[in-house]
Structure formats: structure tokens, C-alpha cells
Design a protein with these regions (language model features):
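His/Asp/Glu-rich mid-to-C-terminal helical/loop segments that flank catalytic regions of hydrolases
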Residues: 257, 369-417
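Noncatalytic luminal/extracellular "stalk/propeptide" segments of secretory-pathway proteins
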Residues: 14, 21-119
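Soluble metallo-hydrolase cores and metallopeptidase-like ectodomains found primarily
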Residues: 82, 87-115, 163-241, 257, ...
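Metal-dependent peptidase/peptidase-like ectodomains
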Residues: 275-372
Length: 417
């Protein structure tokens, strides 16, 4: 058993604060802020005593395509100037950038408008029919020459920001607050002015990796977390990314520090990786899983802790138990009085699972309506709850100890990649 010291709470919290700080500007992949975060993490691994495991010391290059605003977004309908992220937001996965000026045209389910009535117009869809297909709707609008598409998208406190982009996008596509969409829909012909300086670029980024050698060089446990976030908006709106995922990075870093202090070699290698490009489409983990620095036997990914005052539930990255690692992790989680939520998809664990590597994707599953929303300005140190971080750390430590003390678990491994 590894004698894990009680985590250094002050150091752990300072790591989270630094990663969330204005100096890092939201850690958007490929930006100065993300490079500062990577430098901090590599220096932390060096100081902890982990050996470099990247192509260039602690770094491995990753090309990340992503959608990013290069200037403030503006939308004016009639005399009303709308507020970005509160009244409207871009659908980055489907949207191009651009400047559009023109009359508003309302389209409802069952309307039969000619191409001439739509070409060059800015279309608002104020109600979504039950069989609404977003992708085909956007495709049809672009084919008909619609200048921009405004789609009612509920009444959130804040619209979620995304940076997942596509070079196939042809027109600006905007989420619009439902109450605004319904109000303007009754006044077709209103003048609309949209400025969306959204660009899809491929930027050079980096994964950060450190290594602790073990006795059995044929077995390697990967502990990982993504360090990128969404980046602050050009208009100054901050996206600190405290829960997503400064929390996970800080826990994995603290576990790595304490593993490096052990007095004896572990029975297996430990590889620690801080991954980039998660928010843009899992680019860092996809590259890592396709070309790891050594064969991987098992992977533990940590993404998001601190939504609520207590850690009531952890998602595990799978819809059902299917291999030895998920069964082991489920047992450890339950022993800490935490519910296991069998949910899959959306985090870096996906890239490793797709390669057939036993992998769990741990992350707090919010259980309360008032839980902090990630991908909004509310994901900040002021809204972070520390007890889930403490328990998440304890669960990861216990999981590592189970692997140290129970070699028979490793004998169940399906495959080394």
C-alpha cells in the first residue's frame, strides 16, 4: 500500500486558484494563457520528481482545430441591443462567423416560404417542433441562401459557451433566448444587425506528461485530466474554468506529487498527463491514445469536481460495468458513500475506451438544481465547493492502492495497447 500523506490542502487550492486566475485568461487551447498553464504544470511535475515523458521534455505537440471569437459579438434586432451570453450565443459547432444585416423573417413549423422569401434574410425560429432536426435545418437554411439563423434556445441564466468548431459551417447560427425569439417573431421585417467574429483555426498546443517508473515495465497506469478551458471572451467576460477542469488537474497533480515521494518503487509504471484540446473535441486525448509514449494498461481520467457542497455522485465513463477496472472503481466509489452514475461520453476517457484500453472517466455528477453550471461565467473559485475535491482525491488514492495491493486485478486486463 502507498502511504498517501493527507493532501496539502493549501497547495491544492492555490493550484486551482492559479489555473483559474485572470493571468491565464481561461486557458483556451493555443493561447498565451494555455501555454502559461502548461509551463506551470511541467514545472510542477519537475519539482515533484517526475521524469519527462513528452516528445520535448514534458511536452508533446497537438494540433487543435477550434472555434474562437476574435472580437466582441453583437446582435441588434430593431431598436434592441442584445447581450452576448445572456440573450444570445453562437452555436460554435454549427456556425460560421460573419457580419449580417437584413430584415427578419419568421419561420414556424408548417410554413411554406419560397427561396426568394428566405435568401439573404435573417431567419428566426421561435418555436421548435417535436421532430426538430437541428443539423438538417441548418443545412437547408444554408442551401437556400439564408444569411443567418436565430433559434430559440430556452431561458437559461447564461448560455453555455462552446469552442467546438467545424470548417463545414456556412452561415452564422445563433441561440436566442425564447422570450426574445417569440417577441420579435411577431414583427417580421425588423432590421437585424449581427456581428459574429468567429474563426475556425488550427493552433499548435501541447500535452504535458511526466513519468514514474515501476518494477513491472510492462504495466502502466495513466492518470490524466484536461487543463484547457474555453478562454475569456474578447469583451472581457471571464471564463475561469475552476470546476472544468482546474479541479481535476489539481487533484491529479497532488496525487502525482505524493506518489513521487514514496520510499519504494510501485509494481507498475505511472504516467501522468495533462491534456489539451478537450473542449474543442478531445484532440489531446485522441492523439495521446493513438500514439502513447508507452503501452497503456489502465487509464483514470478526472474531469470536474466541486459542483455542490458534497460529492453525492460520480459518473464513471461507462453505461454499464464491462471490465475489471470499472468494477474495481465502482467498488471503491461506493465504499466512500458515493453513488456511481453509469454515464458515458463527453470527456477524454472516450478516446482511450475507443482504443480498447480499460479506462474510467471520473467526474462529479450534479444532483441539485442549484448546482454551479460549467461553461458559464459562474464556473469560478467563488462557486467552488471543496469537500468534493477532498473526497475525489481520496477515491483516486484508494483506487491506486487497490491496484498496488491486488495484482490479480491486473491479471484480468484484456489488452495492452
Amino acid at each position: 500500500m502507498v502511504q498517501f500523506a493527507k493532501r496539502n490542502v493549501a497547495r491544492n487550492y492555490q493550484d486551482i486558484l492559479y489555473l483559474s486566475s485572470p493571468d491565464l485568461s481561461g486557458r483556451l487551447s493555443g493561447t498565451v494563457g494555455a501555454r502559461k498553464a502548461a509551463a506551470f504544470l511541467s514545472e510542477s511535475l519537475l519539482q515533484a520528481g517526475l521524469s519527462p515523458a513528452g516528445e520535448r521534455e514534458y511536452f508533446s505537440s497537438v494540433n487543435v482545430p477550434a472555434a474562437r471569437l476574435v472580437g466582441p459579438a453583437h446582435l441588434k434586432i430593431g431598436d434592441h441591443v442584445l447581450q452576448h451570453r445572456i440573450d444570445f450565443s453562437e452555436m460554435s459547432h454549427f456556425s460560421s462567423g460573419g457580419i449580417c444585416k437584413g430584415p427578419l423573417v419568421t419561420v414556424r413549423d408548417g410554413d411554406d416560404l419560397s427561396p426568394d422569401q428566405l435568401a439573404g434574410k435573417i431567419v428566426v425560429i421561435p418555436e421548435l417542433p417535436p421532430d426538430f432536426d437541428l443539423g438538417s435545418t441548418i443545412q437547408s437554411a444554408a442551401d437556400l441562401g439564408v444569411a443567418a439563423l436565430l433559434i430559440e434556445s430556452g431561458e437559461p441564466n447564461w448560455f453555455h459557451k462552446t469552442v467546438f468548431g467545424s470548417t463545414q459551417s456556412r452561415i452564422p447560427v445563433i441561440r436566442l433566448r425564447r422570450s426574445i425569439a417569440k417577441a420579435v417573431a411577431d414583427h417580421p421585417g425588423l432590421k437585424v444587425h449581427l456581428e459574429l467574429p468567429l474563426e475556425i483555426n488550427v493552433l499548435a498546443c501541447q500535452n504535458v506528461m511526466g513519468f514514474l517508473p515501476g518494477i513491472n515495465q510492462n504495466r502502466t497506469l495513466l492518470l490524466c485530466a484536461h487543463y484547457d478551458h474555453l478562454g475569456d471572451d474578447p469583451d472581457g467576460l471571464r471564463f475561469p474554468g475552476t470546476i472544468d477542469n482546474a479541479s481535476g488537474v489539481a487533484v491529479i497533480l497532488e496525487v502525482a506529487r505524493l506518489l513521487a515521494k514514496r520510499e519504494y518503487a510501485l509494481p507498475f509504471n505511472v504516467l501522468v498527463a495533462f491534456l489539451t484540446g478537450e473542449e474543442s473535441g478531445l484532440w489531446g486525448s485522441k492523439q495521446f491514445a493513438s500514439n502513447p509514449p508507452m503501452p497503456l494498461t489502465a487509464v483514470v481520467n478526472l474531469d470536474c469536481l466541486g459542483f455542490e457542497t458534497e460529492l453525492h455522485a460520480l459518473r464513471i465513463g461507462h453505461q454499464a460495468s464491462g471490465d475489471w477496472l470499472t468494477e474495481l472503481a465502482s467498488s471503491v466509489i461506493k465504499n466512500h458513500g458515493v453513488d456511481v452514475r453509469w454515464l458515458a461520453g463527453g470527456d477524454d476517457s472516450v478516446a482511450f475506451i475507443q482504443k480498447g484500453i480499460p479506462t474510467i472517466g471520473l467526474g462529479q455528477k450534479p444532483t441539485l438544481p442549484e448546482s454551479t453550471s460549467i461553461h458559464t461565467v459562474n464556473d469560478s473559485p467563488d462557486n467552488l465547493h471543496l469537500k468534493p475535491i477532498e473526497k475525489g482525491y481520496a477515491i483516486v488514492c484508494d483506487l491506486v492502492n487497490k491496484l498496488v495491493d491486488s495484482p490479480h486485478f491486473w491479471d484480468q486486463e484484456n489488452k495492452n495497447i
